[in-house]
């Protein structure tokens, strides 16, 4: 029994840590392809097209033993699917990869940690949340948002010196060859513009999360919903990319690094990572998977310092670390809020139960008296 408990704790942890490592590794590879001249818009179209082809049949296999009364082809759900594709695929991915082209993987990681803060601010703007200063969860989310945004400003405005300058590079031939194969950071860059693109991408995915939460409540087959909005988002990206990239040579992919990257990114992003996230959520709850997002800082720093020179700045790591602290603070506030709501609902149920019990105790003697009285 104890071994099973340990396994149930260890397997999701290791799986999520590996998912974050693979995400950063693919981000570095994408940076390499974009630096080599590949269009970010074409890359988004091809990866999502390939991923959608895999995800559609896989989603039906994933939910083959589940039934739902709600049809995915109802107008309310189709509108939601269109908006999910627009915000989560079209807006988010195009802006994110353009931002990556101008910055580096650790900047992408740090800006991605702003999602809970943006979601919190968005919920206030939309009237879904209220600022109750007496509430511990509200104070935690507000403080976490301030800290997280501070990390983003540090990331954007301060680079600092390189952690591993070329003069301190290892004489190891393998390490010297890695920067020639992969690119972590390149000059000239446009750090500020890259952060702006990434910030808008984060805002877009925050909108996506709001709509997705409501959609999953109406239609709980998560993988099917993901496959449909992936197809819709791919079509939107294709129409936009045909306008942006009118040179046919930009659409020609040779059987080289770019093609392998498209296949790997499409397979991992659409099927592998999504499946692992869904399974871990089912096993550990809705707040388990997001807690591993800051692991990307560790992997981005490890890869950047181990295999690349003149690539990772002290300011990048500092800003990402500050953003990570803010991320965990906001996440703790969200968890606290969820516990408070659950406790409040349980109290209401217990009060209703006591109220009904009192009514029953009051009604029973009357019924007895009625039965005993003559007709």
Curated annotation (Swiss-Prot):
Keywords: Membrane, Transmembrane, Transmembrane helix
Keyword Transmembrane helix found: yes
Residue intervals passing through the bilayer: 10-30, 41-61, 72-92, 106-126, 143-163, 191-211, 225-245, 259-278, 289-309, 312-332
Membrane topology: Multi-pass membrane protein
InterPro entries: EamA_dom (IPR000620), WAT1-related (IPR030184)
Gene Ontology terms for molecular function: transmembrane transporter activity
A Gene Ontology BP annotation from the UniProt entry: negative regulation of defense response to bacterium
Domain EamA residues, every copy: 25-134
Pfam families assigned to the protein according to its UniProt record, in alphabetical order: EamA
Domain of life: Eukaryota
Key word Membrane present: yes
Localization in the cell: Membrane
Stretch list, region Disordered: 337-356
GO CC annotation, single: membrane
UniProt-listed PANTHER family: WAT1-RELATED PROTEIN (PTHR31218)
Family statement: Belongs to the drug/metabolite transporter (DMT) superfamily. Plant drug/metabolite exporter (P-DME) (TC 2.A.7.4) family.
Protein name, per record: WAT1-related protein At1g70260
């Amino acid at each position: 029994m104890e071994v099973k408990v340990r396994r149930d704790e260890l397997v999701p942890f290791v799986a999520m840590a590996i998912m974050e490592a693979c995400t950063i590794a693919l981000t570095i590879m994408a940076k390499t392809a974009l630096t080599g001249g590949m269009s970010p818009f074409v890359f988004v179209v091809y990866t999502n097209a390939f991923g959608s082809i895999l995800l559609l049949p896989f989603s039906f296999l994933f939910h083959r033993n589940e039934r739902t009364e709600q049809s995915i082809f109802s107008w309310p759900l189709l509108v939601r699917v269109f908006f999910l594709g627009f915000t989560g695929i079209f807006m988010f991915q195009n802006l994110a990869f353009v931002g990556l082209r101008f910055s580096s993987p650790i900047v992408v990681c740090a800006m991605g940690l702003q999602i809970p803060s943006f979601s919190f601010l968005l919920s206030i703007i939309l009237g879904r949340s209220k600022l109750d200063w007496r509430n511990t969860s509200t104070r935690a989310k507000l403080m976490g948002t301030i800290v997280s945004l501070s990390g983003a400003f540090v990331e954007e405005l301060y680079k600092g010196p390189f952690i591993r300058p070329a003069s301190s590079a290892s004489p190891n031939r393998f390490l010297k060859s890695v920067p020639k194969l992969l690119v972590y950071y390149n000059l000239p860059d446009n750090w500020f513009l890259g952060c702006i693109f990434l910030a808008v991408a984060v805002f877009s995915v925050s909108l996506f999360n709001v709509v997705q939460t409501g959609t999953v409540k109406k239609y709980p087959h998560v993988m099917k919903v993901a496959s449909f909005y992936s197809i819709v988002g791919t079509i939107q990206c294709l129409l936009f990319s045909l306008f942006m990239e009118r040179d046919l040579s930009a659409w020609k992919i040779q059987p080289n690094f770019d093609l392998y990257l498209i296949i790997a990114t499409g397979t991992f992003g659409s099927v592998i990572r999504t499946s692992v996230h869904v399974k871990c959520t089912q096993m550990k709850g809705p707040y388990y998977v997001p807690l591993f997002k800051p692991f990307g800082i560790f992997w981005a720093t490890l890869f950047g310092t181990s295999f690349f020179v003149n690539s990772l700045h002290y300011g990048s790591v500092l800003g990402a670390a500050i953003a990570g602290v803010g991320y965990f603070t906001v996440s703790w506030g969200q968890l606290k809020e969820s516990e408070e709501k659950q406790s409040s609902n349980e109290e209401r149920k217990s009060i209703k139960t006591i109220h009904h019990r009192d009514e029953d105790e009051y009604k029973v003697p009357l019924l007895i008296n009625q039965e005993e009285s003559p007709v």
